[in-house]
From Swiss-Prot:
Binds 1 zinc ion per subunit. The modification N-acetylalanine is found at residue 2. It is a peripheral membrane protein. Optimum pH is 9.0 for sorbitol oxidation and 7.5 for D-fructose reduction. Keywords: Acetylation, Cell projection, Cilium, Flagellum, Membrane, Metal-binding, Mitochondrion, NAD, Oxidoreductase, Phosphoprotein, Zinc. It comes from Mus musculus. It is found in: Mitochondrion membrane; Cell projection, Cilium, Flagellum. The gene is Sord. SMART domains: PKS_ER. One of its GO terms (biological process) is D-glucuronate catabolic process to D-xylulose 5-phosphate. InterPro entries: ADH-like_C, ADH-like_N, ADH_Zn_CS, GroES-like_sf, NAD(P)-bd_dom_sf, PKS_ER, SDH-like. NAD(+) binds at residues 184, 204, 209, 273-275, 297-299. This is Sorbitol dehydrogenase.
Length: 357
């Protein structure tokens, strides 16, 4: 594959709140353990939109121009001198988090918790919404021929669902409540069913998203209106015939987390995936006296191989989640679409010569 010419690396860059621009960046120079990738498909995540709108997420503040994007797949064009398992032409999915050191968290297999981790499009680290991108080869996973680039890009949000279901110990025959029918809620629904959940209820404010949830496998849906958390929990129990053993909360909304506590079966598990306000009011006594375990989720770890196997074996289907596609040259328009909440997953196609999924 021919090496890219200088100046061909079109990139989508956030400069601060409300300020994103398409700019040409230099082609990255490789280290011995890196690969250079020609990017193909990059999904827009809610965090990308948040950095564009607000210039920060919590303590992560955009202080200098930063390339956006972290849900991605592409083709290897060049490898570093120590890379043995990949070669030019290989199609890969990118795990965006790469530990910079082997610390106590890496040693126990929970490298997602290491505080110094490199993570695409998290200040100050650049993302991969660009033509060409450099990444550590150990965190690039070869895609089988049966898995498309778009599916490869969707492994990132799919990994959140896998990790959340692992944290909740979803298993054969479980009844599961998923709060939120956005992209993360949808992949959590797919994974829960793939892991053997007998029945899954999905809640959301949006009727159209709940319709999509039914299409991809939800047994029941509840459109949340002005009901109290206790009333929503009662509806969940009525639909399932009993309280769910596992609740996975994907919105971050205070009332939804409260619903999760009230709804979950005694001795069950509430998994917190959505990130909302730093301080929230919760009925903790209600959780304590019924021994409802509350577990947090921060990104994911050790999920890419399982996700690839699930996609290759057709255990689950993420293709219906992609509702909009834009070429890289129209990335700003793509972000406007994502900001409006139109559709579900917006995908940007970075290779001008290949717009196929």
């Amino acid at each position: 594959m021919a090496a890219p010419a200088k100046g061909e690396n079109l990139s989508l860059v956030v400069h601060g709140p409300g300020d994103i621009r398409l700019e040409n960046y230099p082609i990255p120079e490789l280290g011995p353990n890196d690969v250079l990738l020609k990017m193909h498909s990059v999904g827009i995540c809610g965090s990308d939109v948040h950095y564009w709108e607000h210039g920060r997420i919590g303590d992560f503040v955009v202080k200098k121009p930063m390339v956006l994007g972290h849900e991605a797949a592409g083709t290897v064009t060049k490898v570093g001198e120590l890379v043995k398992h990949l070669k030019p032409g290989d199609r890969v999915a990118i795990e965006p988090g790469v530990p910079r050191e082997v610390d106590e968290y890496c040693k126990i297999g929970r490298y997602n918790l290491t505080p110094t981790i490199f993570f695409c499009a998290t200040p100050p680290d650049d993302g991969n919404l660009c033509r060409f991108y450099k990444h550590n080869a150990d965190f690039c996973y070869k895609l089988p021929d049966s898995v498309t680039f778009e599916e490869g890009a969707l492994i990132e949000p799919l990994s959140v669902g896998i990790y959340a279901c692992r944290r909740g110990s979803v298993s054969l025959g479980n009844k599961v409540l998923v709060c939120g029918a956005g992209p993360v809620g949808m992949v959590t629904l797919l994974v829960a069913k793939a892991m053997g959940a007998a029945q899954v209820v999905v809640t959301d404010l949006s009727a159209s998203r709940l319709t999509k949830a039914k299409e991809v496998g939800a047994d029941f849906t509840i459109q949340v209106g002005k009901e109290t958390p206790q009333e929503i929990a009662s509806k969940v129990e009525s639909l399932l015939g009993s309280k769910p053993e596992v609740t996975i909360e994907c919105t971050g909304a205070e009332s939804s987390v409260q619903t999760g506590i009230y709804a979950t079966h005694s001795g069950g598990t509430l998994v917190i995936v959505g990130m909302g306000a730093e301080m929230v009011n919760l009925p903790l006594v209600h959780a304590a006296i019924r021994e409802v375990d509350i577990k947090g989720v921060f990104r994911y770890c050790n999920t890419w191989p399982m996700a690839i196997s699930m996609l290759a074996s057709k255990t689950l289907n993420v293709k219906p989640l992609v509702t909009h596609r834009f070429p890289l040259e129209k990335a700003v328009e793509a972000f406007e679409t994502a900001k409006k909440g139109v559709g579900l997953k917006v995908m940007i196609k970075c290779d001008p010569n290949d717009q196929n999924p």
